[in-house]
């Protein structure tokens, strides 16, 4: 997608009303002829403990999905029968104006958000207490997300259905949502490339984290989708490493797992590269396996594919690669049956991406008896319009692998003498596009939203500052 097309899409309003119509459509699959109202509350402002400073604000995602409103202390009332959407915003507090300036007015809110009416929240209680409708009319809301003072004029209030319905809706993204994720990816990709170019000049992980954050903020993305992971050497085998404070000297590889948000929509990108500008023999061998895992998995993704099948393809390729290196020994079928590859690839292949990094609607089963599938955050067939991460990995984490070397089911399938050559590789993790990429599922394949390079030769060239990379 060209930049002008992206900007054109994002110049319009966030499509909250079309999302609401979709929610009602799915709601009526569960409750035929559902009548009444949808009621959602945004995140309320809250002080930090023992402080007069406010907590960092993060809007409730389901509220944002139906409004596009990123203000605190707001409410939404949606009339199912008339499809009328009313947003309630905070009133003007004269004492607060001197500190924070004038807040949004109802007219400004109507111009900014895809709603039919904007009122001050001082009118909310009266309107809710006088809601009317037929005997079947119900207020649909989300459990534990209704302020205690709220009283509805209708007797029927259901807080058990709406959240699950919105979860389902959020799986399939519209053009506006895809544009938001693409924008977040474009900015994050610039940050990743900046780290790669700066790596040879840095002495500590924190300097490279600062490089990423600086590039994202400079391009308008002030919020991160999750705390960045900038892990040198063996720290790369820690899946959610966050210290980012260790020296780079004497380390082979750097793993960077970092993604910015664009207006609450996440990116999730991972890249691994040699700090010296050249992979060691062992690192390149592992990188090539993971690169193959990712590329072959991406090649089979399209609407209707079972995510479990894609995940297992990654494990099969990992086993084949580690057998060729001599780290695994024995028959491929025996290794897969024993699930020994979990020692090196212990997490799921990827997850849905959207308003949350680990987005909703994946229906995971963390109690699955099949350990290969237990940590998959997404299960079942992928629909067109969903966005998933593709992040196979091979890790050399002693805490995980050592018990396998003592286990009767696994120890004869791993050659510990060969394994000893690879401990310093740490972790090589790829997702969709350039180690971990984010892909849009289409009827015939994928659209990779992640643009930063991932081919090992290109990575080495960028680190060394070669022309044309």
Curated annotation (Swiss-Prot):
Its EC number is 3.4.11.9. GO terms for biological process: proteolysis. It holds the Pfam family Peptidase_M24. It catalyses: Release of any N-terminal amino acid, including proline, that is linked to proline, even from a dipeptide or tripeptide. Binds 2 manganese ions per subunit. The keyword Transport does not apply. Mn(2+) 2 binds at residues 257, 268, 436. Keywords: Aminopeptidase, Hydrolase, Manganese, Metal-binding, Metalloprotease, Protease. Belongs to the peptidase M24B family. This is Probable Xaa-Pro aminopeptidase PEPP. It comes from Fusarium vanettenii (strain ATCC MYA-4622 / CBS 123669 / FGSC 9596 / NRRL 45880 / 77-13-4). The gene is PEPP.
């Amino acid at each position: 997608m060209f930049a002008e097309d992206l900007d054109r899409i994002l110049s319009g309003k966030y499509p909250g009303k079309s999302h609401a119509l979709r929610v009602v459509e799915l709601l009526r699959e569960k409750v035929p002829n559902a009548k009444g109202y949808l009621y959602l509350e945004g995140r309320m402002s809250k002080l930090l403990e023992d402080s007069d400073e406010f907590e960092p604000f993060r809007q409730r995602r389901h509220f944002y999905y139906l409004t596009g409103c990123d203000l605190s202390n707001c409410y939404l009332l949606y009339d199912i029968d008339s499809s009328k959407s009313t947003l309630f915003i905070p009133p003007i507090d004269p004492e607060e104006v001197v500190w924070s300036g004038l807040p949004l007015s109802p007219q400004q809110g109507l111009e900014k958000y895809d709603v039919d009416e904007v009122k001050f929240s001082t009118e909310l209680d009266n309107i809710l207490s006088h809601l009317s409708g037929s005997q079947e009319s119900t207020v649909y809301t989300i459990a534990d997300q209704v302020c205690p003072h709220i009283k509805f004029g209708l007797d029927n209030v259901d807080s058990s259905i709406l959240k699950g319905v919105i979860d389902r809706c959020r799986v399939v993204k519209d053009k506006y949502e895809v544009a938001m994720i693409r924008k977040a990816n474009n900015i994050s990709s610039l940050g990743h490339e900046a780290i790669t170019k700066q790596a040879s000049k840095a002495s500590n992980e924190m300097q490279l984290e600062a490089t990423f954050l600086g590039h994202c903020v400079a391009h308008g993305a002030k919020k991160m989708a999750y705390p960045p992971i900038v892990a040198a050497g063996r720290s790369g085998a820690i899946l959610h490493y966050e210290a980012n404070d260790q020296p780079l000297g004497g380390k082979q590889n750097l793993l960077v797992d970092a993604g910015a948000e664009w207006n609450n929509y996440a990116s999730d990108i991972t890249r691994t590269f040699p700090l010296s500008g050249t992979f060691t023999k062992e690192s390149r061998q592992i990188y090539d396996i993971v690169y193959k895992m990712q590329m072959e998995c991406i090649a089979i993704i399209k609407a209707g594919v079972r995510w479990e099948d894609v995940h297992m393809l990654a494990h099969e390729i990992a086993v084949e690669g580690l057998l060729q290196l001599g780290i695994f020994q024995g028959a491929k079928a025996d290794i897969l049956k024993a699930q020994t590859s979990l020692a090196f690839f212990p997490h799921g292949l990827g997850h849905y991406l959207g308003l949350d990094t680990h987005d909703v609607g994946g229906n995971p089963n963390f109690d699955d008896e099949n350990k290969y599938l237990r940590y998959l955050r997404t299960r079942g067939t992928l629909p067109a319009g969903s966005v998933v991460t593709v992040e196979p990995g091979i890790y050399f984490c002693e805490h995980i692998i050592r018990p396998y070397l003592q286990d009767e089911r696994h120890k004869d399938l791993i050659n510990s003498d060969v394994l000893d050559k690879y401990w310093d590789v740490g972790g090589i993790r790829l997702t969709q596009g350039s180690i971990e990429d984010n892909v849009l599922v289409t009827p015939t394949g994928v659209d990779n939203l992640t643009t930063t390079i991932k081919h090992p030769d290109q990575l080495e060239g960028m680190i060394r500052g070669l022309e044309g990379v």
